[in-house]
From Swiss-Prot:
InterPro entries: MetalPrtase_cat_dom_sf_prd, YbeY, YbeY_CS. This is Endoribonuclease YbeY. It is an enzyme of class 3 (hydrolase). It comes from Blochmanniella pennsylvanica (strain BPEN). Zn(2+) binds at residues 116, 120, 126. Keywords: Cytoplasm, Endonuclease, Hydrolase, Metal-binding, Nuclease, Ribosome biogenesis, rRNA processing, Zinc. The gene is ybeY. Its cofactor is Zn(2+). The lineage of its organism: Bacteria, Pseudomonadati, Pseudomonadota, Gammaproteobacteria, Enterobacterales.
Length: 157
């Protein structure tokens, strides 16, 4: 699958855009996930500030704190086919904080978070240990495919 079969609507909804990964980076990271699919894939990637992420986490998950990534799968109406998988929302401040706290290169952690969020759109989860182990293994494999050596484990809020 070529990268042009993965379409990303990149929304930059944060005040400070300096140092963010560019569209091409997100495109390559997401394309690595979907390289086994032989169909067109579309998703929205929205980068937000901590205030918006806090609100989204509270509104949708009833958690009164911000988080690093949220995923919102799209389910088309019955009988309708759509290449749209859903939305991945990433919090700039939390991802940058985690990167520094864990001493992980910024690009590596951004790649990890978009991969993590995209896997949620495909139905992967980490609610129970068995699912978490599988999801982390898939994340590591994709990160290696993207040229990153390790995958840090990030506590999910």
């Amino acid at each position: 699958m070529t990268s042009n079969q993965v379409i990303i609507d990149l929304q930059l909804a944060c005040k400070n855009l300096h140092g963010l990964p560019n569209r091409k980076m997100f495109q390559s990271w997401v394309s690595a996930i979907f390289s086994i699919y032989k169909k067109k894939i579309e998703l929205t990637v929205r980068i937000v500030d901590i205030k918006e992420m806090h609100y989204l986490n509270w509104y949708y998950l009833k958690k009164d704190c911000p988080t690093n990534v949220l995923s919102f799968p799209f389910t088309p109406p019955l009988g309708m086919k759509s290449p749209l998988l859903g939305d991945v929302v990433l919090c700039r401040q939390i991802i940058e904080y985690e990167s520094k706290e864990k001493n992980v290169p910024g690009r590596s952690h951004w790649a990890h978070m978009i991969i993590h969020g995209s896997l949620h759109l495909l139905g992967y989860n980490h609610i129970v240990d068995k699912e978490a182990i599988l999801m982390q293994r898939v994340e590591r494999n994709i990160l290696q495919k993207c040229g990153y050596r390790t995958c840090c484990h990030v506590a999910h809020r």
